[in-house]
Amino acid sequence: MKKNIFTLLILVGICLGMTSCELFGLSYAYSFKNEPGKDFDTLNCNAYEFIESRADNDLTLMYEAINRAGLKDLFEAEDYTYFILKNDQWDDYMSTAKYSCIQDIPVSELRTYILGYIVHGKYTSKDVTNPIYLESMNGVQIMRMYKTQTAPTSSQNLNSLVAGWVNPDGGVYQRGCITSNLVCTNGVVHILSSRLIIVV
């Protein structure tokens, strides 16, 4: 009897946890019928709380970078779209820039870099039927976003978002999102497949 009650409590806890940020898993949003992109259910947390909930998992360095740059308030502010980097993408950035850890990056550089991944307004894949160009929050990068409309492969989500910074020559070195349309209480989060790059 005790074993059955214990099992039932575990199952109830898992079900409740699935709606929280703490146990929310990043999933792939495939649509094989070229249907309009769909939003995930609104998460019961803001973008900062979502990242904080994964600080012990795949968003450790993103969480550290936001706090070191003093940008927590922006990730709690209303009406923004955030492109998020996982740990391996931060490792790639630090390796390229010759930093050994987040704490080595000058705060001003870190702020500029993170702000380049944020645009004002809430954009999901169904809001971007044609490519759009938006100024990033750092006032330097222009971001081009569009929705994938080709047949999916093992590494591509149909109707997911694709983004990139516009290079000085007008070209865009674009990156897909491994997860799109995570609608938080204050904006939209997209998880990039790799970091954005500008060619100078």
Residue ranges and their predicted role:
Residues 10-14:
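Hydrophobic helical h-region of N-terminal Sec-dependent signal peptides
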Residues 75-76, 135-138, 183-184:
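Extracellular/periplasmic catalytic domains that process cell-envelope and extracellular macromolecules
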Residues 52-60, 84, 104-109:
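Soluble non-cytosolic domains of exported or imported proteins
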